[in-house]
Every structure is written in C-alpha cells, then in structure tokens.
C-alpha cells in the first residue's frame, strides 16, 4: 500500500464514515514518501561504494604485496560486518543492512581474489554456493529483504556460470536456494520476494533442461510443482505472485507452438518427453493443485491448467488448439479480474488478450499478406483493441464503485 493509494481512497472512507478525518490524516502520515526515499539512499550508497572499492582494488591488485592483499580482504570484510551490526543496534536499520550487504559482497569478492592469489583451480561452483549459503544465513539472521535479493541473485548467476563455464548443473546450489530462500519466502509472504524467487526458480529449471539436453517438456514438471505450491498459500497476492511466472512460461511456450510449429521440420526428440511419465506427472500435480484451490475456495482457477494441456502429442491441429488455449486463458484472466475487481489482473488479462490476438493475426496473415500492409493493419488492430479494452475496464470498475454507494 502506498501513500498515493491511501490519499486516493481515504476520502471515500471518510465519506462513508468508516474512519474520521483525523484518522485519515494519521493514516496518511504513516506513509511518508520522504522518509522512504531517504531510507533507500544507504542501500544505493552501499552499491556504489562496493563497486568503487572493487574497481580500485582490481585496478591496483597486482601492485599490492600478497600478505597485504589477504589482510585487506579480511579487514574490509570484518569492518563492513562490524559496522553493519553497530548501526543496527543503534536503530539505523537501513544503513546497517547496507553495510552488512557490503560485507557479503566483500566475502564473495574475497573468495575470488584468494583463488587468484594462490592460483587455485575451480572445477565447479562450490565457492559460489558457499557465498550464496552465507547470504542465506545472513538473510535469516537479519530478516532482510535486501540480503534475500542479493542471495537470490548470487545463486541465479552462479547457476548460469556453472552451466556456461563448467558445463554442469549444480543441484546443491538449487537445493540450498529452494529450501533456504524458499522457506524464507513462505514465512514472509511478501509479493516482491515471491515474484523474484519464482523467476529465479523457473530460470534455473530452464538451465537444468538445457544443460542436461533433456526433452523440453520436462521443464514444466518442476515449474508446475512451483505453481501447485502457490495453491496452498492462503494470501491471494502471494500465491498469485508465485504462480504468475510459471503461467507466463506456459503462455510463451504456447505462443511458440502456434508461430513456429511445423510437423514437417520440427524435431520431436528435443521436445517430447515420455508420454506416460510426463502426462502422469502433470495429472498428479493437477490433482494436488485442484485440492489446494478447493481448500482456499479458488476452484475456478483450475482453468489455468488449460495452458498445460499436452496438445503437442496429437498428430494434427496442434497450432489451432494452442491458439484456442491462449484465447481461453486470456478470457479467463479478464473474467476473473472483473469479478474480483482486481485492477492488476484486469490489466494482465488485457495484455494477454491483445498478445493472443496479435499471435493469431500473425499466424494467419504473415505468409500471404504484403508486409507493409501487415504492419499497418496490425498496428490499427492493436490500437483498436487497446482502446476498447481500456474503455471497457473503466466502465466496469466505475459501475462497481457506483454499486458500493
């Protein structure tokens, strides 16, 4: 909730006598944008200071004696951690967390620099995993979102580095990230953290499939397991944040199947998983998902699984079925957004419907229509749909607000 939103909705609460004018002013006073902006400054300053120190040390590293290098690493890291703890005890949380984050960055930089000093050869990302584990422990110690995001970034980048540099996937890094940071996400029920965790998990699942050269459909088993976990979260916003990235991944896959699938040239070996195991896994996840939805009284959201229908195993009509799935899913999101009067879901559904329409337009007209005419008509169609859907959204939301009076 932001100050701007409170200032917009507050007068209506006063008008309905839900709160008094004095209470409204007190609530607005709790959301001081100036204090929030000032609180961000130490975090930004810590990032700039860390980059400056790393740049300076890297530029002069070879000229510094080895013993002094090691001493510098220990002193800088200790100073940041000590300073962070001192400021936290003084009640200056933002500055304390910023210095602690610099200590974490210094720890990771120290691992790399010590390896260079003693010419240590790495064959995996164990050192990065230790760095991420340290960040996870600090996250629990200080209950900090900033440290959480840094730790999540460390694990994600480390996994990418492992697959690119060493051509191997680190199950240890994934397990520590999923269990350690996943449990913290479950505890905090914070929308931003949940979004970021979901994105990192999906990206690492993609890296796993690519590194192991498995059939691509296996990607959706762990991804939809994450989606299923979201059905057991009571808070709607947090559950939706956990599920949105898996749904986006399934939506993009459906778009690819519509636009690029060709039975004559497509390689099924790179795409299709073993039917019995894959479909059985999806059915099991679907059952657990529906059970969670029914428990949370969100049974209608089971329709979201239409994007996971295994149309790709059919012998014909694959593009048409995936295109229909795109439209049905878009209509469903719009419909739920209007029923729940949830502006984010309405906007998201509007975007999905426009994307689905443009995918259908491109699929049906690209091969035979003049390209200039294709883009002109496509632009006009896009503008018309955008205008109509936004107008419809405003009308429905206005009617809903009018009905509350």
Region annotations inferred by a language model:
Residues 1-405:
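Alpha-helical multi-pass membrane segments and their bilayer interfacial helix-loop junctions
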């Amino acid at each position: 909730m932001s100050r701007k939103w409170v200032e917009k909705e507050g007068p209506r609460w006063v008008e309905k006598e839900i709160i008094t004018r004095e209470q409204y002013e007190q609530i607005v006073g709790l959301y001081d944008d100036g204090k929030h902006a000032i609180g961000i400054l130490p975090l930004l300053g810590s990032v700039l200071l860390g980059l400056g120190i790393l740049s300076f040390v890297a530029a002069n590293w070879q000229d510094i004696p080895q013993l002094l290098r090691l001493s510098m690493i220990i002193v800088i890291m200790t100073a940041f951690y000590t300073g962070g703890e001192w400021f936290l005890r003084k009640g200056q949380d933002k500055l304390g967390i910023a210095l602690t984050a610099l200590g974490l960055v210094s720890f990771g930089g120290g691992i790399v620099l010590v390896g260079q000093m003693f010419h240590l050869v790495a064959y995996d990302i164990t050192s990065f995993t230790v760095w991420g584990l340290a960040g996870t422990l600090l996250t629990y110690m200080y209950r900090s979102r900033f440290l959480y995001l840094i730790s999540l970034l460390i694990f994600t980048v480390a996994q990418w580095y492992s697959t690119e540099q060493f051509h191997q996937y680190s199950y240890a890094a994934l397990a520590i990230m999923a269990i350690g940071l996943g449990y913290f996400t479950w505890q905090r029920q914070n929308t931003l953290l949940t979004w970021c965790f979901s994105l990192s998990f999906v990206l690492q699942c993609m890296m796993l499939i690519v590194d192991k050269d498995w059939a691509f459909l296996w990607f959706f088993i762990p991804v939809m397991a994450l989606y299923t976990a979201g059905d057991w979260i009571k808070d709607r916003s947090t559950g939706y944040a956990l599920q949105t990235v898996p749904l986006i991944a399934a939506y993009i896959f459906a778009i690819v199947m519509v636009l690029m699938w060709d039975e004559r040239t497509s390689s099924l070996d790179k795409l299709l998983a073993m039917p019995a195991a894959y479909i059985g896994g999806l059915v099991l996840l679907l059952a657990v998902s529906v059970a969670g939805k029914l428990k949370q009284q969100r049974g209608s959201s089971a329709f979201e699984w239409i994007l996971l229908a295994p149309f790709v195993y059919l012998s014909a009509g694959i593009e048409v079925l995936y295109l229909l799935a795109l439209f049905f899913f878009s209509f469903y999101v719009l419909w739920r957004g209007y029923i729940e009067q949830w502006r984010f879901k309405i906007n998201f559904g509007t975007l999905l419907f426009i994307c689905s329409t443009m995918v259908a337009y491109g699929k049906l007209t690209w091969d035979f229509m003049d390209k200039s005419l294709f883009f002109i008509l496509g632009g006009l169609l896009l503008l018309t749909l955008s205008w109509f859907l936004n107008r419809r959204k405003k009308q429905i939301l206005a009617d809903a607000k009018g009905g509350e009076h």
